[in-house]
Every structure is written in structure tokens, then in C-alpha cells.
């Protein structure tokens, strides 16, 4: 091999390694880790991760089980916002699980709390419309549905 062909060989090798890494990561994510299940509305997908099992089991005993699945409360409406949220959350859930750095007990992020709060207000608009204005302000004003009703979706 001539000295001038080394850069081309390195580029081909680097490209092949990068491609192999991407394929390997994709196979791991979608086959071993059941990543395909997160593209559905099946609540069982949330229970794939053992740290979510208690939340899933609590949901199966809650009244919302009859009317809502995980995505109804934990992802925003609309195809693109829903899957952006699922991808973002999936990345961080995977990161924290892989590194062992997930908080115990689990805590909902402020962004995801806002999504859940807006879902409560959407489904229960007939009730929340008549509540005092402090309750109908921004979810981040300190008063939210879960301030008083934090165990409704997931009975402790």
C-alpha cells in the first residue's frame, strides 16, 4: 500500500467501525432491550425496566387504568411531541440505568411534570374550569393537580 492510500484506508476503517457501532447499538436497543416496545402505547413497555415495575403495578390498581395508558398522561399530545418526549426520556432512562445513577426514589422532571399536569387539566377540564384561578395558572406556580392528588395515577 502506498503512503498516499493510507488516509483512504483509515477513512474506510473509521466508517466501518462507526457503522458497526451504530448497528450494534441499534440491535442492542431494539432487540435485547425491547426498544421497539416503546414505540407502542402498551403500558407493559414501561415495565420493561425493573425500576418502573412498582409504578406499573400501582397503575394496574388505580382507577385511571380503565381510561388511560402511560402515554396519555406522560407524553404530550401530537405525534411529533409524543415521540420527541419518548426519545428524550428513553435516552435518559437508558443512561441512568446503564450508569446506575438513577435517583431512588424516582423523581419526575419538571418538564415531564408539566406534561402530566396539562394532561390532567385536559381530561378533567369540566372540573378544573370551575376551580379558583390559582389552580388554573401555570403548572410551575407551586400548585398543581399532583399537589393534592399525587397518588391518583399510581396508587402507593
Regions found by a protein language model. Give the residues of each.
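Short sequence/structural segments immediately N-terminal
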Residues: 2-156
Amino acid at each position: 500500500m502506498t503512503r498516499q492510500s493510507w488516509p483512504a484506508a483509515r477513512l474506510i476503517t473509521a466508517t466501518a467501525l462507526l457503522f458497526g457501532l451504530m448497528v450494534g447499538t441499534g440491535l442492542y436497543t431494539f432487540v435485547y432491550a425491547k426498544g421497539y416496545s416503546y414505540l407502542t402505547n402498551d403500558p407493559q413497555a414501561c415495565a420493561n425496566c425493573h425500576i418502573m415495575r412498582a409504578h406499573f403495578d400501582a397503575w394496574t390498581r388505580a382507577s385511571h387504568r380503565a381510561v388511560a395508558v402511560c402515554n396519555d398522561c406522560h407524553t404530550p399530545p401530537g405525534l411529533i411531541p409524543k415521540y420527541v418526549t419518548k426519545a428524550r426520556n428513553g435516552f435518559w432512562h437508558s443512561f441512568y440505568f446503564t450508569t446506575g445513577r438513577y435517583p431512588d426514589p424516582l423523581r419526575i422532571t419538571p418538564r415531564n411534570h408539566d406534561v402530566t399536569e396539562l394532561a390532567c387539566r385536559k381530561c378533567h377540564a369540566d372540573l378544573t374550569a370551575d376551580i379558583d384561578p390559582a389552580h388554573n395558572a401555570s403548572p410551575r406556580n407551586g400548585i398543581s393537580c399532583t399537589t393534592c392528588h399525587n397518588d391518583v395515577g399510581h396508587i402507593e
